[in-house]
């Protein structure tokens, strides 16, 4: 209030502070609008702050004074972004091929204007939605957030849902031991998840592909033909599915039996029954347990969603390669669409490993293109101010003779 009076400000406004663990508060800034996090206040007060803002804009007084507010419980807000946490949180650009929001209730709220099929571009902030939850205390709110993130499914482009879920489960975060070094300290658990995947998930992904084939080639609607799924005269009653994950080929073999299949993968055998409930749900019985597994299926592959994490499997392609977003040894490519803000090298320049060659900016994030080794710049294809697309070759790079040797 004193800050607003000091500048003769009249109207709706919010003041931001940084608060230490001991309660010491430091002024940050004042905005002439609501904050992005205003739903947190709405959840614990039961007030509609957007209505308040409109009333104040019309010259009306605040509907309630501070002492009239009643604070109940604890609320948290997570911003679901199209970004790549494991790659420095760079924005992810593309079309959302599948989008499923958590079920909303008095304890779970989703604020978003994004729908399935929308394009995330370089021209706007890549936020997909705000997910706000309420609980009677911080522990209950964290549990609610974990459950809600587990129901939030996005496919078609990178996103931070899995990162947010790992953060919610992080002991430092759960105990509110928060500072700007948290992510760096917890890098191994937050940004470098294990590449290991359970046999059950591999077999489930393969079963989805197998059942999808059957759905695309249905048998006649005669009860006789429905008694043995996949039965073929004079052929082995088994089927092989191959998928790729993280550059490795995964091969699962299914043998039909009276009830479901026996799946063989990596030397293990598992009895499994499954049915596609709809385009995004697999009902299965695995290891004696019945469960439902959410998934998304595109021309490129299958993504499974389980407990806030997503697991992507690609269909087998003969031309599959493991080239990363930085390109090969001899070229460097744009990791995302954006504008070239600096070009720091020219043809024939000698550079050292990790030297910054140029910088690229998209959606308020600057990304540095660095030399992978000591070498020489053969060509630089763009100038400052040029717009580039993801995958555009930016620099042709040659290793020094001693590096090659």
Question: Would you name each region that the model predicts?
Answer:
Residues 296, 300-334:
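Catalytic P-loop NTP-binding/switch module of NTPases
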Residues 4-11, 59-67, 291-292:
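Active-site phosphate-binding and catalytic loops of NTP-dependent enzymes
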Residues 9-35:
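Conserved metal-phosphate-binding beta-hairpin within the catalytic cores
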Residues 270-288:
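A conserved acidic, glycine/proline-rich C-terminal tail/linker
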Residues 18, 35, 39-269, 390-396, ...:
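Catalytic cores of soluble metabolic enzymes centered on carboxylation/carboxyl-transfer
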Residues 322-405:
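Structured functional modules or segments
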Residues 267-268, 305-306, 347, 355:
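C-terminal amphipathic alpha-helical interaction region
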């Amino acid at each position: 209030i004193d800050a607003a009076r000091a500048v003769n400000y009249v109207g709706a406004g919010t003041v931001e502070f940084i608060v230490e663990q001991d309660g010491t508060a430091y002024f940050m800034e004042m905005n002439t609008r609501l904050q992005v996090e205003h739903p947190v206040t709405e959840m614990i007060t039961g007030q509609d702050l957007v209505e308040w803002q409109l009333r104040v804009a019309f010259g009306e007084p605040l509907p309630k004074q501070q002492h009239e507010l009643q604070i109940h419980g604890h609320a948290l807000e997570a911003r679901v972004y199209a970004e790549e946490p494991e790659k420095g949180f760079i924005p992810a650009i593309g079309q959302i091929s599948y989008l499923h929001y958590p079920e909303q209730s008095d304890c779970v709220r989703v604020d978003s204007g994004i729908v399935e099929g929308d394009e995330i571009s370089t021209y706007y902030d890549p936020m997909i939605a705000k997910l706000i939850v309420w609980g009677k205390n911080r522990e209950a709110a964290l549990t609610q957030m974990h459950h809600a993130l587990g129901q939030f499914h996005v496919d078609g482009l990178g996103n931070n849902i899995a990162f947010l879920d790992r953060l919610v489960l992080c002991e430092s975060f759960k105990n509110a031991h928060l500072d700007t070094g948290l992510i760096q300290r917890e890098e191994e658990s937050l940004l470098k998840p294990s590449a290991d995947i359970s046999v059950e998930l591999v077999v489930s992904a393969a079963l989805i592909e197998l059942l999808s084939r059957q759905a695309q080639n249905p048998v006649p609607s005669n009860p006789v033909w429905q008694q043995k799924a996949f039965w073929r005269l004079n052929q082995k009653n088994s089927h092989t599915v191959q998928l790729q994950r993280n550059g490795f080929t995964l091969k699962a073999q299914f043998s039909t039996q009276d009830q479901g299949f026996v799946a063989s993968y990596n030397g293990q055998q598992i009895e499994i029954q499954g049915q596609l409930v709809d385009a995004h749900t697999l009902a299965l019985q695995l290891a004696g347990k019945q469960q439902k597994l959410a998934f998304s299926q595109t021309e490129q592959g299958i993504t499974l969603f389980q407990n806030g994490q997503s697991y992507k499997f690609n269909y087998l392609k003969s031309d599959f390669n493991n080239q990363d977003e930085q390109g090969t040894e001899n070229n460097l490519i744009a990791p995302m669409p954006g504008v070239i803000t600096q070009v720091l090298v020219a043809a024939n320049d000698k550079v050292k490993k990790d030297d910054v060659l140029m910088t690229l900016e998209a959606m308020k994030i600057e990304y540095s293109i660095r030399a992978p080794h000591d070498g020489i710049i053969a060509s630089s294809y763009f100038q400052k101010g040029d717009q580039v697309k993801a995958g555009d070759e930016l620099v042709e790079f040659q290793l020094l003779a001693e590096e090659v040797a």
